[in-house]
UniProtKB/Swiss-Prot annotation:
It comes from Vibrio atlanticus (strain LGP32). InterPro entries: YcgL-like_sf, YcgL_dom. This is YcgL domain-containing protein VS_0884. It holds the Pfam family YcgL. Disulfide bonds: none annotated. Residues 1-84 form the YcgL domain.
Amino acid sequence: MLCSIYKSSKKEGTYLYIPKKDDFSQVPDALMQMFGKPSFVMVIKMDGRKLAQVNIDKVRESLNTDGFFLQVPPPPVNELELHKERKAQQNVQDEE
């Protein structure tokens, strides 16, 4: 199975996977509006391959059921909240 990958012109780190190059007919209009102008990245062979950011089985399933897969970046890490949590844990340990 081949898959074409496009990156979003509006949302950094967002990628759209579709089964046929330049065929966005299965992608909802609202999603295309949010995605912006797709910029072609590459075509990949899905068989026997791993992807860095997403589970390839989820991509395959979505391509087969929905006709596309949308990869969004993970949410940013809130360093301030992490620091507060570490500090609170440290204070609890110091009290023990």
